[in-house]
């Protein structure tokens, strides 16, 4: 939380405890051990700027009704030397505290002093956390679910970083197993269809996308029909060796264009090459957590909350995808991460329990793995669902989206709804350059402040640091409401980190822009007496700082003019 908010909470606790002790000494309250109580910021500011349940929390200790306890506390309450100018009781014993100008002055001073660091905290205590997200199969182009996952994962990682975690972003490339076998088969058949008189047909469960045909044609253009004269195994190996790196390179290019920068692209094939997949089987076997049946190696998943035991190694000697997944998560812990966050599509919900159970099986706590399930995306145009790209006539891919929609809009709009909610992405809204587009609305607030500052500087007015007395001139409801919102930014970051919910920050900054526009329409800056003008300029600069910090954190551009 911001320093001023932290001080205010501490002051409420201190004056309540002092008043209780004073009331006990005066015989107004019986002698008792002081109880624990909470100090919160009410959602409804008519209930005060801070509120405490101290009277209700101490009812059992004092054996008195909360309203009587509250009355005794109020009679002995001393607010001198605090941020607060008054306190009052409400309801069944709540005590509400109202802030004075010193708090508002300190908030603005703190924002301008900390500048780009405002909002950051040590809440995470530098714990090492890995956020693994997108992790799309490299067998085809990335889709809208990957677009949402990219924005969600990257912005969540940034929120965690701001909250004091040591964050690592990772993309797990599934370049092994059944999906890759299917990829090789599909490429081989498409390649043969270019040259053979009676080529094989694609099986129903193979990849039918045009991207597969495009890769086959590209190989044929470079190498001709040379693979028609080799074995099927050699043909598949050559085509996978040609197509897979191209697909991975395209995925990396799309993510870079999307402003998603990973610390590592981790290849599943490396787990197999390094022997880590079979090593995890041996690890579980040594712990007595496997058995053999029908020639396969089984893991006793039911001992860790699973509905059924799971195959680790098939009868043909090949490990399952689940085995590789366990090995990958063990690898993460072996690299020293304290907390793992995976973002999966909601269609993987059935795998959550068995994956968390496997964490216990490898000697870790299931609580160290958090899995966020993300709902699907529906693209909308003219109020109707749309699946095909206007430009290509094919299914819309991430690359297509980024060609049509500004990256700023995509990153912001994909974080407008919580992960567990279906999201309608409005393609028309995303390209609008007006206040209907939420990211434009927020960016415009920042640009408007920059415009105000430029206009005044052109007239010879230079913003300066204000005294507490000058900042005390900010008394209009719109001014105080805006400062209160600015003061809550650090708490919002911490809350978003706790809940794994960057959407909370998206909503926060939209509301900040709304409160700024409301302030600007109600309170003149230019033309006021110099001290008041400078105080309002300070409020403008503080608002711009917070907007800039949010947009920068989300890797969205921060325009100074629009």
Q: PLM features: residue spans?
A:
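Non-catalytic interaction-recognition regions
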Residues: 2-105, 116, 120-562
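Short, charged, solvent-exposed linker or helix-capping segments at domain edges/interfaces
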Residues: 106-111
């Amino acid at each position: 939380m911001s320093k001023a908010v932290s001080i205010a909470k501490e002051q409420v606790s201190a004056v309540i405890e002092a008043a209780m002790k004073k009331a006990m000494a005066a015989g107004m309250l019986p002698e008792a051990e002081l109880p624990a109580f909470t100090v919160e910021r009410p959602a409804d500011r008519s209930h005060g700027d801070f509120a405490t349940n101290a009277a209700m929390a101490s009812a059992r200790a004092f054996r008195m009704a909360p309203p009587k306890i509250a009355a005794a506390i109020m009679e002995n309450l001393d607010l001198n030397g605090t941020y607060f100018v008054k306190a009052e009781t409400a309801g069944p014993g709540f005590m509400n505290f109202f802030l004075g100008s010193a708090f508002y002055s300190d908030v603005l001073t703190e924002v301008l002093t900390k500048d780009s660091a405002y909002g950051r905290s040590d809440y995470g205590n530098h714990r090492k956390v890995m956020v693994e997200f997108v992790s799309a199969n490299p067998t085809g182009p990335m889709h809208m679910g990957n677009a949402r996952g990219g924005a969600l994962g990257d912005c969540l990682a940034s929120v965690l970083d701001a909250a004091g975690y040591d964050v690592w972003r990772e993309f797990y490339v599934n370049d092994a197993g059944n999906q890759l076998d299917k990829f090789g088969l599909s490429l081989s058949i498409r390649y043969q269809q270019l040259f053979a008189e009676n080529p094989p047909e694609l099986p129903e469960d193979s990849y039918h996308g045009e991207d597969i045909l495009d890769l086959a044609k590209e190989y044929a253009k470079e190498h001709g029909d040379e693979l028609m004269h080799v074995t099927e195994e050699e043909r598949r190996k050559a085509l996978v060796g040609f197509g897979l790196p191209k697909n991975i390179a395209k995925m990396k290019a799309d993510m870079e264009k999307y402003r998603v920068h990973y610390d590592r692209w981790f290849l599943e094939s490396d787990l197999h090459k390094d022997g880590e997949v079979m090593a995890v089987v041996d690890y579980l076997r040594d712990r007595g957590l496997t058995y053999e049946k029908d020639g396969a190696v089984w893991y006793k998943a039911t001992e860790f909350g699973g509905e059924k035991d799971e195959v680790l190694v098939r009868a043909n000697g090949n490990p399952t995808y689940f085995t590789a997944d366990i090995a990958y998560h063990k690898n993460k812990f072996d690299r020293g991460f304290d907390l793992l966050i995976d973002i999966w599509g909601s269609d993987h919900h059935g795998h959550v329990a068995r994956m968390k159970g496997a964490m216990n099986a490898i000697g870790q706590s299931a609580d160290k793995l958090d899995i966020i399930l993300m709902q699907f995306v529906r693209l909308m145009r003219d109020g109707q669902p749309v699946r095909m790209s206007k430009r290509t006539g094919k299914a819309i891919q991430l690359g297509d989206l980024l060609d049509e929609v500004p990256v700023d809009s995509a990153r912001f709009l994909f974080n407008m709804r919580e992960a567990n909610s279906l999201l309608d992405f409005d393609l028309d809204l995303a390209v609008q350059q007006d206040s209907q587009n939420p990211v434009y609305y927020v960016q415009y607030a920042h640009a408007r402040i920059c415009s105000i500052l430029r206009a005044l500087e052109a007239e010879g007015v230079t913003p300066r640091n204000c005294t507490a007395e000058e900042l005390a001139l900010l008394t209009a409801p719109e001014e105080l409401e805006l400062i209160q919102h600015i003061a809550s930014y650090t708490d919002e970051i911490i809350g978003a980190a706790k809940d794994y919910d960057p959407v909370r920050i998206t909503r926060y900054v939209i509301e900040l822009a709304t409160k700024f526009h409301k302030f600007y329409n109600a309170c003149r800056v230019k033309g006021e007496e110099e001290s008041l003008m400078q105080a309002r300029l300070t409020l403008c600069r503080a608002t711009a700082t917070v907007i800039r910090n949010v947009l920068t954190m989300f890797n969205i551009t921060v325009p100074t003019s629009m």
